């Protein structure tokens, strides 16, 4: 039995008594249930259920509280005392949450005090008149600095109180007068559970206004990224608000931003890791801030160029390199007939690797940096067609000669050692079995056997594992080797055939006359130790078979002999495979799924040279 008295009925008091709402600390509660929250910040926050003996409610553990909870491995029955917290009411959804920043453990593994306690959300749903009203918990400071009457009203969702944690106090102290008028939050703290907040942030990226037209009508949107010392968050405005905020916001300047709506981020449209993004609308308030202290100009998570070979295709990375070569710009035409300008540059770094970076449209035309310049590239996309390369996207940023320590160090290395160095390229080159000799030597040395990959359980780490094998293709599945994809530019979603013979894409909300077939090919490979099933997606399958999926699908229907000839031509041929292993769970069954990240035919001269070198080393040992 528990010898500790819980703060019985305290949750009801917090949300019905103004004095308790303003100071909701010191309560003693029991852990009622636990579960990890979803999202990119799940390692920082835990959503749990706590009980005061009469009611139970949700608690979101943040910062120190989240770290403590995980390190102590707290579980149902443990009793805690809350040290720092603030309540929040999400009025639209009738949710009541306690945001806990710190607590202490009072008793472990206590018996449950009341397993039939009332869920607080349900109680207040039945007794809505008992809770504090907006005017009771929204002081004048929280609605100050409004510029017109339409913005002066209380927002739809009731605000949390303005108790600040340590990180938030650091931001508020940058402006001594702001603490009474606005709670300054760190960007990493933003979530739908905070409803009165202001961030002080720099516009680290500003996109152009984009327009669209479909069956539902016309529209336009505008994107910016906001940056502070804790992280970055994407913001989007639509239609008239896109025009309004495009005129207000300038890249590089610092602003106070408040009253924007928080919604889950869409990873396919952003290179940031924040689990939420801002929607700038009629209620959003943005004021320029002339105190830029403690607001960084940019934030990077650099990786070395040699690590790009292990990155997922279509992932976004930050890189720092020296511009080694600059190619002339040229023109490309898409399947839809749209023309694009492109320029390729090559960057190198002190990992000994080089990689191609594709610039597009106006950036490709205007590029004028000299060779030997330092380039910091943020949010550049990893591609894999004929080897790994990088491609600038709509929100990628290239900063020339940035004034950061890493850039000075890299420039010093290049001037003293790197200018005349030989670099390994990740781009495949004709005539060398797909790669340079130096690159092939490195890949040959990295090989392991299939049996070793299976014995070491590669793929069970959180992000999966990469490994290389030399193996022969023993079988190719010719059924369901491709899927019908949308034929619109930059859309690969599966389409469904309609009764009228057209193919519909729900994402684009369009019907097209024919699909664009894309590979999802399954093969079996063998080496001297074991067998493995692999999946190849479109780029890798085209490289293996030498034809695209549209062509092979036509041959299957119109020329079965040629179809068989192509599919059998690769069987029992040896290749070098770069494989990504990752654990998959389906119907509560876990298994390792293997996909091909890269492949190339064997270069027997390089193989012989490598074996000769290894024999020489063994003889000299």
UniProtKB/Swiss-Prot annotation:
Modifications the protein undergoes after translation, according to the UniProt entry: The N-terminus is blocked.
UniProt key word Cell division: no
Zinc finger region(s), C4-type: 486-508
Gene Ontology MF: a single term: zinc ion binding
Swiss-Prot/TrEMBL GO biological process terms: DNA repair; DNA replication; DNA topological change; double-strand break repair via homologous recombination; establishment of protein localization; heteroduplex formation; meiotic cell cycle; mitotic recombination
Principal subcellular localization: nucleus
Pfam families assigned: Rep_fac-A_C (PF08646), REPA_OB_2 (PF16900), tRNA_anti-codon (PF01336)
Modified residue annotations for N-acetylserine: 2
Residue spans binding DNA: 197-284
Keywords from the UniProt entry: Acetylation, DNA replication, DNA-binding, Metal-binding, Nucleus, Phosphoprotein, Zinc, Zinc-finger
Residue numbers bearing the Phosphoserine modification: 178
GO CC, one annotated term: chromosome, telomeric region
Family, per entry: Belongs to the replication factor A protein 1 family.
Miscellaneous notes: Present with 4100 molecules/cell in log phase SD medium.
Subunit structure: Component of the heterotrimeric canonical replication protein A complex (RPA). Interacts with POB3.
Protein name: Replication factor A protein 1
Organism: Saccharomyces cerevisiae (strain ATCC 204508 / S288c) (Baker's yeast)
Gene: RFA1
